[in-house]
Amino acid sequence: MRIVILSNPPDFSAYLSEMLKTWGLALYEGVNPDVLPALDPMDAPVVICPASEGVRRYAASLIAYARRGGTVICFLPEGALARAAGLENEGEKELPLRLRITAYPAKGLAGELLPVVGHVQTYQHASEVQVLAYLSHPGRYQGESVGITETRVGHGRIVAFAFDLALCVLLLRQGDPSRAEVLSSNAPYARTEQLAADIGPNDSGWIPFADLLSRLFVDLVRRGLQAPTPLLSHLPGTAGGMLLYSGDDDRAEAAWNDEEMDVVAAAGGRMNLYIIPIRTKSTTVDVQRYLSRHDVGPHPDIRALDGHSVTERLAEFERQIRMFQEMFHVPARSLRNHCAAWAGYLEPVEIMERVGVRMDASYISGTYLRNRDYAPYAGFGAAMPMRFCRPDGRLINVFQQHTHLADDEMFSRREYSYKFSLELFEVMLHRILTDSVTRFHTPYTVNFHPGNFVEFSGAQGQELLRQAAEQSLPVWSFDQWLTFWEARDTWRFSALTWDGARLQFILAGSTSHDGLCFMVPANYAGTSLDEVRLDGEITDWQQETRYGENMVLVPIPAEKQRISVSVRYS
């Protein structure tokens, strides 16, 4: 059993694959649409069809596949495919929009609406069509239309999105390329926050809306498989959430860095210190001391080139990354730009890929100098690491990990700060971390500058570490998280079968990590899991609740790269 993703570039097939992999559904295969006539729904129960100009050419084959019993998941269907799905296209829909889920509970949501941007069409639907979600305009009663539909076609079905999901998630997470280098009077230099797509009112900032939208897609795929599908856990061990801790060195004294690092280490955590190589006060000896317990990375500062060309700023960005590596003899694994300064759209990320940086933390939540929304996921709605994707659908091998809190923006007395007291932060933080552990199961990421930590934000930082311990959250550095994520990225499922009582599959990967686990549903179709075997040997497992679903977590043995798994239900 496998998931088939039709690949006919230019399209977003690679980004849809990245969504499946991000959420652990590593059971997919990209194929050319020409294989559709021979595709057996018993072997490939789900076919994902990205929005592209070529879909009309093989629409008949998609419809025939659905009639044979398969599930087609498509986006912006046209012509014969739209008619088979019981839809009639009435043209482009005005943006921005909100998606209201109506048929099935969506993971991580509790009635909230999801922002939708990008390319959206208005469809009328036939009476036999089941509507799974509706699209509406924020602040307006008129203009509602279907957002996601499901239609029986022969022995199978067609699930249709009225919008290009991949483009929508890309724009939400990475921002809008049309906003690159657009400056404002409040922030007269290019910043990552200024890329944020226009989603209308800030009513979704307390949920990682871009991630939950991609998770909705993944769960629709899972429904189509009609089996207790395994997933790679995206968190280490049995953790229900994560705290990713970092600090930007800026002009900090080495003693200030040590003070914050001591506090984090005493809490059992590890942090990243991001260093500006052109003006750090830390020596090579200092950095070696930091590395005994923590991680370091570059913090390029291109602000001296405000107003200069994108090309000049990119050259300085690359120069400082290389300078950091040469100064401290440390590979640059992850980074964050000083002041979140940026150049162009994805050009800095392409440089990261070229020089070996594999995770970027420069996209900061909130609406800094645009309005006064401080919610943890405001602006980009993302907490999960995903590879960057170019607007033409090609992936960049750099993971985008958003930063949710910067201490100067939240606690300082500066004009732009929200100026929250410790007492108020305690209440907000309890909500944020509780949601992370019980609803979203995603990392919460922070930047506590050492200079600020010793001056005004130390109490908030210690409260964060205290509540993280209370919620049993691992406290990791970005580099540590990246190491886990890179190892997880190598693992795939294959040869999956389900006979109604026994689930069997092969799990294989090239890089081990002691935090890696896979998980399967504890209950399925009236049955309950009662045994897991790895290579024929009964193994221990632990039941946890993830997104309201009882899941069984099984550690992946560190010494193995290929495992035969058998799971019995009764």
Predicted regions and their residues:
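Metal-dependent polysaccharide deacetylase catalytic core of the NodB/CE4 family, i.e.
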Residues: A85, G240-L243, E253-A255, M261-P348, ...
